[in-house]
């Protein structure tokens, strides 16, 4: 059985699917960090393993809660990101280093 959840984070995207042996998260963000953090803390725990985290694109309201999710769960095994051109990779690396 598949359990699909659309989390109430306001403007943003944060969904998950729980299969028998696989947990998947699609995007992980919200413009309202307080709403998003509440969802992360209520719906995930240190026992949870996210097998795959899919990121559709890098808008703030799709990625702003990734650090919170990472700090809350035991492990995120794989991250799937959109195809990036060379200049986008450089920009992403430089922004993440700040």
Give the location of each predicted region.
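Active-site environment of divalent metal-dependent phosphoester hydrolases
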Residues: 11, 58-63, 86-87
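Conserved beta-strand hairpin/beta-sheet module of binuclear metal-dependent hydrolase folds
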Residues: 1-44
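Structural motif
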Residues: 28-30, 58, 84
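Active-site metal-binding motif and surrounding structural segment of the metallo-beta-lactamase
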Residues: 35-81
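Flexible, acidic/histidine-containing loops and adjacent segments that form or flank the divalent-metal
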Residues: 72-98
